[in-house]
Regions:
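Surface-exposed extracellular loop regions of Gram-negative outer-membrane beta-barrel proteins
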Residues: 1-48, 110, 115-122, 200-205
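Exposed, low-structure sequence patches enriched in small/polar residues
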Residues: 42-205
Length: 205
């Protein structure tokens, strides 16, 4: 504990089974300034008996929040061999970078439209080694959102997702399709594009 809402921590896990062992070491910290700025970061690595060397990871974000503007940036990365044997990792072998911004407008006292906001979020995801090789991102996600808060407790939210997903060939290395003449490797498609809106209206409580 560094005082206030600031902290610094250490994580160490150890799992062994016979001659096999998995160890994870990480540092994490949290810093908040003036209730406006915040930085959170974690970095570490895993070491596993049947894998040469260590496998690094990181997860970090920086955010700012004011009455009219807020936003942030975040990044995470997990080496293909990173293995938290006593924990859970939703998806490894990936690097993600994201950024978001929100602009809030306030109506005059007694106005029908009390508050409105517009936000955008952009995220890119790479295969871990591809990121360091300078490859294009496999997945790109862009999310613009409009929100309107009206007098009396009515709320209108308009969310749109615009996404493109690349083909992760390593996921299908051993996946084959049966044909009339035998089996063929699954090839997939280069990219899948997805777009859609979601509109929600909340009535007064």
């Amino acid at each position: 504990d560094l005082g206030g809402q600031n902290s610094l921590g250490v994580v160490y896990t150890d799992r062994m089974h016979g001659d096999w062992a998995n160890r994870v070491f990480a540092l994490d910290g949290n810093l908040i300034a003036n209730d406006t700025y915040s930085i959170r970061a974690q970095t570490g690595f895993s070491s596993t008996t049947d894998i040469d060397g260590i496998a690094p990871m990181w997860n970090a974000s920086a955010n700012v929040s004011t009455r009219k503007w807020s936003g942030g940036v975040n990044t995470s990365g997990y080496h293909a061999d990173f293995d938290p044997a006593v924990g859970f990792l939703s998806r490894g072998n990936q690097v993600t970078i994201g950024a978001s911004a929100v602009r809030t407008f306030y109506g005059k006292e007694g106005a029908f439209l009390e508050r409105s906001s517009f936000s955008v979020r952009l995220t890119g995801a790479w295969e871990y080694q591809g990121f360091f090789d300078g490859d294009d991102p496999e997945d790109i996600r862009f999310y613009p959102t409009f929100n309107f808060q009206m007098r009396g407790g009515w709320n209108l939210n308009i969310f749109t997702w615009i996404e493109t997903f690349g083909y992760p060939g390593n996921f299908f290395t051993h996946y084959y399709l049966k044909t009339d003449t035998g089996f063929e490797p699954y090839k997939g498609v280069p990219n899948l594009f997805n777009i859609g809106p979601m509109i929600s209206l909340s009535t007064p409580q």
